[in-house]
């Protein structure tokens, strides 16, 4: 059964002039139900995350300052949201949602988190509406609990998953692929294992063609049961 992490707090209250489209976290569940992709029974409310599961990914000093609302103005400015306890609670809920989703996926094959994908959060700093990297936290949860020996992260957001790429740059257990706009944020990009960059106005056919040129081969290689010596070499962005 498809399990979907969602809580009403995912739509955090913001000033109506704020540029972040927070309403999408309310509209997505409504659309999924409207199109009969799922029903109310598919949704679950995440529990409370344990600090130890965050600290497999994030530097402790940063995490404590974040939770205590003690980031300096310079540290908080890249987040882009007004800081509050409820915002941090929401961020932790999202990360726990991804932990529960990856656990459900081991049983059911697939799960989703309505507000997941906080891929701009680095190990020791926040960036671009992302404070805790739920993808990295979920991956490390599986690895630390011996529920997986290697993880493949495929990021299809228009923005590069720079935080995720940085966090796993030296971890051979996690392979990162990012498909993103060449000229889009972040303007200084990190290096994923594979970065596939697109020009503005790329159409569906070209996008899918380049996905098909990368993903099947990587999935076949990376899920092979035989051990292999994977180097951290990168494919060119034109892959």
Regions found by a protein language model. Give the residues of each.
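Short glycine-/acidic-enriched loop or helix-start segments at secondary-structure transitions
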Residues: 16, 123, 163-164, 233
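An acidic/histidine-cluster motif and surrounding catalytic segment
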Residues: 1-137, 141-148, 174, 181-184, ...
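Hydrophobic alpha-helical segments, chiefly the membrane-spanning helices
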Residues: 235-239
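Glycine-rich phosphate/diphosphate-binding loop of Rossmann-like nucleotide-binding domains
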Residues: 158-159, 165-193
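Conserved small/polar residues in nucleotide/adenosyl-binding loops
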Residues: 222-231
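Active-site rim loops that border cofactor/substrate pockets in soluble metabolic enzymes
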Residues: 192-213
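Glycine-/small-residue-rich active-site loops that bind phosphorylated ligands and cofactors
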Residues: 127, 159, 203
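Well-ordered alpha/beta subsegment
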Residues: 150-153, 158
